[in-house]
């Protein structure tokens, strides 16, 4: 692991280093589901199971489920025989449950439910899901299936503008994704920790490149080319900070040794659409370990990191092409983050 160091003298430290491809050789690829059409021209519902990580607890039966479907009009007169108009595609995250039911039974029961879809707004545009129908195999997910759920529209809907307000809409499920949670540890980093900033600290970030079996340009993603000439997309996530006392920064070599000793292993899952799972097999500093919640199995959902890129992976195969450690100065606390901007009638920008 060799770092290329920035030539910018204003940066106290900045370096990029690639991890070995062996760190994601097991679990670095998610295959897409090939669609099948029945004699009526409708897509046959399917399921797929993903088992990222080291599978330390193979029989704990905890799983994360997310289903995908067509948002279509609800016909007022079903006997008309007219085909329902498909508006867009949406993801319906069900969350974590513990079940010993066969995946096919889970899928069939999901498809038997009546799932309604409604567009609304809060701080952002929202999608509201509601469902009705008898539950047997899906009892571990009873709370979300009977109580309803609401999500940021950009995270779960491909084209929210196509969801009609004047007509009732329903979700016709065609795919169920099951991620087995067979490793001990947490499956989400607290958002407050992801936004944690510290003076005189070095931020430890990961830059992940993905090969996606899709036309990136058509999806509005420019991307870049890897060493084989294949177009790839990338996203960045934050793991923690290397903090030194007395107002000093750690050196590049020190951080390099710390990262090497962690022996990180990467794999892909389907939590929230696409998720990056990280396992720490080696030694980690106490401070960094505390920032990670004292867990050695971590998960980052692309739904939260980059929802636009996440939507592109819904029905396309995806593979890790490259993972790089990025060391950057942590953004100082003095830097203001403006979530809201107000402009008065004189054109002056006011602090939110």
From Swiss-Prot:
Keyword Amino-acid biosynthesis (UniProt): no
One GO BP: virion assembly
Superkingdom of this protein's organism: Viruses
Region described as Disordered: spans on this chain: 1-20
One annotated Gene Ontology cellular component of this protein: host cell cytoplasm
GO molecular function: structural constituent of virion
Keyword tags: Host cytoplasm, Host nucleus, Host-virus interaction, Viral matrix protein, Virion
Short name of one Pfam family: Matrix_Paramyxo_N
Keyword Ribosomal protein: no
Coiled-coil annotated spans: none
Cell compartments where the protein resides: Virion; Host cytoplasm; Host nucleus
Assembly and interaction partners: Homomultimer. Interacts with host ANP32B; this interaction promotes M nuclear localization.
Function per UniProt: Plays a crucial role in virion assembly and budding. Forms a shell at the inner face of the plasma membrane.
Entry protein name: Matrix protein
Species of the source: Hendra virus (isolate Horse/Autralia/Hendra/1994)
């Amino acid at each position: 692991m060799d770092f290329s160091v920035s030539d910018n003298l204003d940066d106290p430290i900045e370096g990029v280093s690639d991890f070995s491809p062996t760190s994601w050789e097991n679990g670095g690829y998610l295959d897409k589901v090939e669609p099948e059409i029945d004699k009526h021209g409708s897509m046959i519902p399917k399921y797929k199971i993903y088992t990222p990580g080291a599978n330390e607890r193979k029989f704990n039966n905890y799983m994360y489920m997310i289903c995908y479907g067509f948002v279509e009009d609800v016909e007022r007169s079903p006997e008309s025989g007219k085909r329902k108009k498909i508006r867009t595609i949406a993801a319906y995250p069900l969350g974590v449950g513990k079940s010993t039911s066969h995946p096919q039974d889970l899928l069939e029961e999901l498809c038997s439910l009546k799932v309604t879809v409604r567009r609304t707004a809060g701080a952002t545009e929202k999608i509201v899901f509601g469902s009705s129908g008898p539950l047997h195999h899906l009892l571990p997910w009873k709370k979300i299936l009977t109580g309803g759920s609401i999500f940021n529209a950009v995270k779960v809907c491909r084209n929210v503008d196509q969801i009609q307000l004047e007509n009732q809409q329903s979700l016709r499920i065609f795919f169920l994704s099951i991620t087995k949670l067979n490793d001990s540890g947490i499956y989400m980093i607290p958002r407050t920790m992801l936004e944690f900033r510290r003076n005189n600290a070095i931020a430890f970030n990961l830059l992940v490149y993905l090969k996606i079996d899709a036309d990136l340009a058509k999806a509005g993603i420019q991307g870049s080319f890897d060493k084989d000439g294949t177009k790839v997309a990338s996203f960045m996530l934050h793991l923690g900070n290397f903090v030194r006392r007395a107002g000093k920064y750690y050196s590049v070599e020190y951080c390099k040794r710390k990262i090497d000793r962690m022996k990180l292993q990467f794999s892909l899952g389907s939590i929230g659409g696409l998720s990056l799972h990280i396992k720490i097999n080696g030694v980690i500093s106490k401070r960094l370990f505390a920032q990670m919640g004292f867990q050695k199995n971590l998960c980052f959902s692309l739904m939260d990191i980059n929802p636009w890129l996440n939507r592109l992976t819904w029905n396309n195969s995806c593979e890790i092409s490259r993972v790089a450690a990025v060391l950057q100065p942590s953004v100082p606390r003095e830097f203001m983050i403006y979530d809201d901007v107000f402009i008065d009638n004189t054109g002056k920008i006011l602090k939110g």
